[in-house]
Amino acid sequence: MADMSVKQLADLVRTTPERLLEQLKEAGVAITHVDQTISDEEKRKLLLHLKTSHSTETGKKRSKIVLKRKKLSVVKSGKKSVNVEIRSKRTYTKPVVEQKRETEPAPTQEVPLTSDTTNLNEKAEVNVATLEKAVEAEVKEEAKKTPSEKKETPKKGPRKETRRSRKPDKEDKWEREELHMTKLVEERRRRHKPAHMPDSDNASAKLEQGFARPTAPVVREVALPESITVADLAQKMSVKAAEVIKAMMKLGAMVTINQRIDQETAAIVVEEMGHKPKLIKEDVLEENLVATLGEQTGEAVPRAPVVTIMGHVDHGKTSLLDYIRRTKVTSTEAGGITQHIGAYHVETELGMITFLDTPGHEAFTAMRARGAKCTDIVVLVVAADDGVMPQTVEAIQHARAAKVPVVVAVNKIDKPEADPERIKTELSTHDVLPEEWGGDTMFQPISAKTGEGIDALLERILLQAEVLELKAVDNGPARGMVVESRLDRGRGPVATVLVTSGELHLGDILLVGREYGRVRAMIGDDGRPCESAGPSMPVEVLGLSGTPVAGEEAIVVPDERKAREIARFRQGKYREVRLAKKQTAHLERIFDRMGEGKQNTLNIVLKADVQGSLEALTEALNKLSTDEVKVNIIASGVGGITESDVNLAIASDAVVIGFNVRADAPTRVLVEREGVDLRYYSIIYDLIDEVKKALSGLLAPEFEEKIVGLAEVRDVFRSSKIGAIAGCMVVEGVVRRHLPIRVLRDNVVIYEGQLESLRRYKEDVAEVRQGTECGIGVKNYNDVKVGDQIEVYEKTQVHRTIA
């Protein structure tokens, strides 16, 4: 602490400089003027003196007040009367330190220790004087109430027990019992402490510290893993778990103390409670793996470009690739549309090119995004007779997101209605400008049917590849990307891997996302087995533990034990995150259902041939859900339909859908015996349309009202049997019996009900047409007046469909 003057210290401890000089003099510090400097040693000396003097004074100085009360009463029982005298005595003994604590508010700012200690004596003297005045006033009031009683002034003295005078023997026994009980209570209250025990008041005075409560809440940085329990989250924020549960209830989530929540939910809770979330990823094992593998060393050599063919459905993408490969790939796809990512390595006269053929249907957005992610050049196929379509625009966006150049192939120029110039104009609205218009995009008119312009397109692709200077290391551990995966009967999980660098060999340990395994076989795009694959080569890999997710990175690991450890770690982490999100969504659905009616649900067990198709179908079917009906995919997987799938469908009342897969013989027997709805599809259009029809059948019926006729009340007749009969004139349409009606008065609906009787000339009739008079009886309504209008309408059910 820096030296300061006496005046500055007095301002700091909030006392007068003269008072501080007196205390310094008592402490033996030789300072006589307020402008003199006081050192740290002199401050400690002053503080020690104040502590010593204060503890001595507080040990001796106590305020002790004794109050006595006497109450006289007469109890009568028959002819006898008994005088009852009740005497009570109360002693107030209050230490100075306790008075100070009760009267002084808690400090809100942290001040130096010398400030509290210096002012302690002055405050204590004021508090004792205030207490004495209050007690004297109370004694005076007691004296006014009982004038015959002797006044006793409060006395201060040593802490000795004040004994009561004994009661005379003449007192009644009930009075003696009550006084005896009062005496025990008083003895217990004023019990002496042993002489050897220290005085608690002196000890508390000596231990008084200069600590002040924090004036602002403590803001912590809370590290959040990908999933965390509520108890662990509360511990990280140093609060009780009940506080976290309360905060989540305010946010609309009912949780328990041991429930796991995902990282996003935990971050919202932490921010709600005033702390800072820090999102962390538990990737220590993977970081160690990357450090072990390190960067690939070796000389980078030129590699073949990876070209992705994208565009709208039926614009001729696969036909173009078919002409290049001289094979009929299109004939193998159901309905003539591509539903998988096909990876093909083509050797042309100008060089090697790897083609990826992506689906054009809107459901395969994720597939197209993966195709653009692992590609070097995008060939955008646009039909000259059809123009720019939604999936064409989406393909442009994927190419921009992946930052890859685009080559536009204007297909079907052999058709008479082809207009290539219109294609250029439409694409220019999406910032795709041809080179002749000052842009940087190459346009090439082609015909996949006749082969016109195909060679020029390949030249443009290889020219663009030369500009990009594509190179990769062709030796060392391989790295690649999973383009597609499926479960093949007899061969197990099959993954199509596009090698991006290094060289993949038979027998390598391959780690792909949550799956791993030794490469047992490799098959090229031509269907022949191969022993190795270099950069830009697509191969089918057999031997993995399961079907990996399409788009995952594939890495060759030197140790199988390490690959197994990392795969299991990823599986556990994925399971925790999935359960946390599922539980959160389940609780949110509970709150959503509280105020709503029951939502009709269509349960589906979905099986597909490849992972990409399964992913696209799941997303497309989930998009069909509305507020009234919902698609619930209770199970999905890659591979054929098994008995376990059918048993699950039986238990959950679900429809089994197979996309390009079939059920085996025992499964078909079980399906026929149990009557399970099993459907096969090979075209995604048909599958989505059928599910839409099924959902439309689950929609609640909707009724449409149609006004049939309108009658005006001209007179009202009263009948003892029926009640009020309205004599009406039909002014519009036809009035039919037993149809619902509305009674209008001044064009305001005052009653809705049923038409009970319809008569004409005292005869019951089925209907009355326009311009005819009739008598109308309204069921359970007699307040019909002249001038009212009776509107007759009918309800028709409208067939509802999912948009």
Swiss-Prot record:
Keyword set includes Magnesium: no
**Region of interest (G1), residue spans:** 311-318
Domain tr-type G as annotated: residue spans = 302-471
- Where does it live in the cell? Cytoplasm
Regions of biased composition (Basic and acidic residues) lie at 138-155, 168-178
Mark out the compositionally biased spans (Polar residues): 111-121
What protein am I looking at?
A: Translation initiation factor IF-2
